[in-house]
Amino acid sequence: MAKLINDIKEKFNKQYANIDKRIVVCGGTGCIAGGSQQVYEAFQKEYKKRGLPYTVEITDGCREHSTYISKSGCQGFCAQGPLVSVGDIFYTKVKVTDVEEIVEKTVLKGEVIDRLLYVNPTDQKHCKTLKDIPFYQKQHRILLADCGKINPEDINEYIGHGGYQGLVKALEIGPEATIEEMKKSQLRGRGGAGFPTGMKWEFTRKSKGDEKYMICNGDEGDPGAFMDRSLLEGNPHSIVEGMIIAGFATGACKGYFYIRAEYPLAIERIQIAIDACYKTGLLGKNILGTGFNYDLEIRYGAGAFVCGEETALIASTEGLKGTPRPKPPFPAQSGLWGKPTVINNVETLASVPVIFREGPDAYRKVLVPGEFCGPTLR
C-alpha cells in the first residue's frame, strides 16, 4: 500500500528537480487582503512578457531551468504582507508595481532590493532571509512546519514532504494498534478541554453501532481567532490525513469538516484537498487496497459562537438549530444522528500525521512536563 505514496513522492521530486528557481507568494487571508493574488498574477504576466520559462504547477511538462511561481499558506508575518520569497530572499509589503524590478534584479541578476527587505526596528538592520528576522528565529514549528512553504492546493507537494506516510503506517498496523500509538503519544484535545485523544477514539471504537462518524471542529468562536484557520488554509492535507487516520481507527464510515462560512478560503482549500484525495485513491472505496471505505464532506457553520460546543456543533451539522444538549450521553455513545461520533479540533487532527510519521516517542519530546502534559505551541 506504500507503493502509491512512494511513487507519487518520487515522481514529484523528479519533476521538481527541473525547477531552477521558486517564487513563493503568500496566499494567506491577510496577504490576499493586501493584494497578494494580484502580485501572484503579475509575476506570471511578467514572465510571459519576457518569454521566460515558468510553471504554476509541478507536472511532467515542466521545462528545465524554469521558475515555479507558487502560492503558499499564511507565513505568519501578516503585518508585513504581501510577502514574497525568491529562493531564500524574503521581501515584504510587495506591490504589483514591484514585480518587474524583482524579476529584473533578483531573478535575473541575483541582486537584493534593500527597500523590500524587512528592517529590524531594534538595530535598523535589513533582514535578507526569513531566518534573519527576530520574529522567526526562535520558532520551532511542528504543525505549521510546512505552512508558508508548500503549495496548499497541491497534494503531490504534500506527499513530497512526507505527507500520507502516517496514513500508510496506520493502515499497516491496524485500528487497535493505531489507537495504542495515539495513547502512547499522550496527545490531548487541542480545543481546550484536553481530553486524551487516544482514549476518545477507543471509546468510540468500542461503542455499539453499525455507523460511526468523525467531525472536525473548524469553528473558532473567539473573534479574531486565526490559528485553526491558518492551518486549514495553509496545510489542509495535514488535517485531511488526520481525519482519515481517525476514521480508520474509530471505525467511522464518514467524516465531516464543520467550518464556519466566514472562512471561504479555508473551505475552498479543504475541498480541493478532499477532491484530490478521491482522485488519488485516498478517499472513497477500498482505500489503498485495504478494504477501508471512508468519505469526507464539508458542512458550513453559520458563525454562531455556541456551535464551538460539541453537542451544539452536532445539532448544526444535522441541519438543526445549534443548541447544546445535556451530557450524558456523550458523543462517543450517541452523537451525529444518534450514532457514535468523535469530534476533534483542527490542531488535534493535524498532530496525528506527525505522530505516525515521527513516532509517539518523538512527539512526546515536545510535551510540557506535568500532570496535564500537552504539546507546546506549534
Name each region found by the language model.
Residues M1-R378:
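Feature of Fe-S/electron-transfer and energy-metabolism proteins
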